[in-house]
Every structure is written in structure tokens, then in C-alpha cells.
Amino acid sequence: MGIIETQYDLEKDLTVVKATGKMIADDFHNWTDQYYRGTVTNVVLWDIVQADLSELKTDDIRDDAKRTEGLADGRSGGRTAIVTGNALEYGMSRMLEAFYDLESVPFEVQAFHTIDEAMQWLGVKD
């Protein structure tokens, strides 16, 4: 089980999420359920550079897209950037992008190799 830490910068309408350790599907499901019951921002930055996603399966990623679609109306038009640390995490994040498109999740998702690229795409300035 991994660790997910969440920080908010409400002036920038930004949530920064950092995942570390060996992640399982329930880590993400629990975070998603908790997030959408609380403070929701228009832009979200996921930092998974120190996360190990090797336990996740394609079905887990598809299920995440379905679960998120049912909860995410409040983020319509928003953006989520995922910063990855290696080829596995980048590929899985790209797969998540595709599943979110298929499920018509109401916000954009894109994977990046650096936080700077992600923040630029999110439109967040220091």
C-alpha cells in the first residue's frame, strides 16, 4: 500500500497530489472518493515520480476512469497533469488519458516528464 499526500493552493485553484511507494488500485480509489467529497479544484497536479505502479492492471486503470466519471461533474473543463518518473508510469498515465476520453470524464488529463511542463500546461504560475 502506497502513500498519497494532498495539498491545496486555493488561490491558484490547484490541488497537488504526491504518491509514493508501491501503489495498489484501492489507494487511488480511496483518494478519489475522499477528494470528491471534500475540496475540489479546477486543476490537479499528480506527482507520481516516487510511486511504484507495477501492481496496477489495465482493468484497474479502466475502473478508475469509470469511477471518476461518476464523480467529476464539479471539475468540468478542468485539467489534471500527471508527472511520471519512468516509462512504466508514463505509459500507464497515457492509458489513463485514453480511458478518461472513452468514459467522457469532463476534464482533460495529460502525462508529463517534468513538473515545469505540467505546471505550464495547467496554466499555473508561481
Listing of model-derived features with the role each one plays in the protein:
Residues G2-D126:
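Amphipathic, Lys/Arg-enriched alpha-helical "gate/interface" segment within cytosolic domains
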